[in-house]
Amino acid sequence: MESYKSEFIDFMVESDVLKFGDFTLKSGRKSPFFMNAGAYVTGSQLKRLGEYYAKAIHANYGDDFDVLFGPAYKGIPLAVVTAIAYHELYGKEVRYCSDRKEAKDHGADKGGFLGSKLKDGDRVVMIEDVTTSGKSMEETVPKVRGAADVTIVGLMVSLNRMEVGQGGKVSALDEIHEKYGFEGKAIVTMEEVTEYLYNREHDGRVVIDDTIKAAIDEYYKQYGCK
């Protein structure tokens, strides 16, 4: 496992972003784990988060893109901090763009987007916290492609939950690839998280013990990718 991956897993636990217990997801599924990117609230946390996203994007997509697009609302700060980190780490200037839940009807920046305008020929990397079932892309992709003649290079999420999408046959990220034609990648997968944290102590406690591991295994029997 690359060092930035293990560091990111530790970072999620330290930031109380990755939790284990009983949760109901947006998709309606009952899950033994939950990731809440909204728990990144301090300047130092956001700085580190942007760096991990930037490293993962660079490792998977290289430098051949122009815009980081973060869907509202959680994707907005993700796109901003990653654009900053990408410039600091790799010296490349990339723009950020996000959609508005409600279009602005006045001012120089009126319309359905904030940040940089999308232009014909732009190569776009989408950025989200986590994709469970792919529902979020149903609104976002048409908006981005309808704004200009752009190429969506790919989608980067922080955690690949490695479970089936809405169709119930392939993973949410594979489903997005089949439906929209671009690949989805993640900083880490849930398999990597489980393997790394199983029986490992954080602040004097084991994060994933035998009971939690059994619950995760049972969850993937029902929702895991085949």
From Swiss-Prot:
Pfam families: Pribosyltran. InterPro entries: OPRT, Or_phspho_trans_dom, PRibTrfase_dom, PRTase-like. This is Orotate phosphoribosyltransferase. The gene is pyrE. Catalyzes the transfer of a ribosyl phosphate group from 5-phosphoribose 1-diphosphate to orotate, leading to the formation of orotidine monophosphate (OMP). 5-phospho-alpha-D-ribose 1-diphosphate binds at residues 26, 73-74, 100-101, 104, 106, 128-136. Orotate binds at T132, R161. SUPFAM superfamilies: PRTase-like (SSF53271). Pathway: Pyrimidine metabolism; UMP biosynthesis via de novo pathway; UMP from orotate: step 1/2. It comes from the Bacteria. Keywords: Glycosyltransferase, Magnesium, Pyrimidine biosynthesis, Transferase. GO terms for molecular function: magnesium ion binding; orotate phosphoribosyltransferase activity. It catalyses: orotidine 5'-phosphate + diphosphate = orotate + 5-phospho-alpha-D-ribose 1-diphosphate. Its cofactor is Mg(2+). One of its GO terms (biological process) is pyrimidine ribonucleoside biosynthetic process. Its EC number is 2.4.2.10. Belongs to the purine/pyrimidine phosphoribosyltransferase family. PyrE subfamily. Homodimer.
